[in-house]
Amino acid sequence: MKKFLMYTTVLLLTAITTFACSKDKDEDKATSVTIQLVDLLGKPVKGVRVYAYDQDTWNTIGDETFHATFQVVSDDAGNATFTNLDKGTQFTSVNNETNTFTFSAHYTLNNSSKTKRVSITLKKGDNKTEKLVLN
């Protein structure tokens, strides 16, 4: 009986330690967004800076590029890819691991400064894509 009790205790402690130290699946997944920039003909637009603002920053400051939470320049395929949006305090238990990011593309067309924006609500671990037509 004593041996059985000792074996059960060791097995139980091993199980508790294993499950307590394992990572959640969502912790392994980075939260990311790809903004696809295209012109009126659907051709990719490269070299455009896109700014990302978390909900608190957007609500407080708006589209002030100096205060952007993240920024990326679109690549040859017109993609501005934001990875690891969950670094920092953007996703917490306070906001139920959810945050709305506003993405703002600043560009010039026909010698005029323009801005196009899109807001995307994300849960921690999401991977979303949105297209912006720059016209």
What positions do the PLM features span?
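Sec-dependent bacterial lipoprotein signal peptides
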Residues: 1-20
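Exposed beta-strand and adjacent loop surfaces of beta-rich binding modules
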Residues: 32, 47-49, 100-102
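Extracellular beta-sheet/turn segments enriched in Thr/Pro/Gly and aliphatic residues
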Residues: 115-135
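Bacterial signal peptide processing site
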Residues: 22-25
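Short, ordered, surface-exposed loop/turn motifs in non-cytosolic proteins
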Residues: 41-65
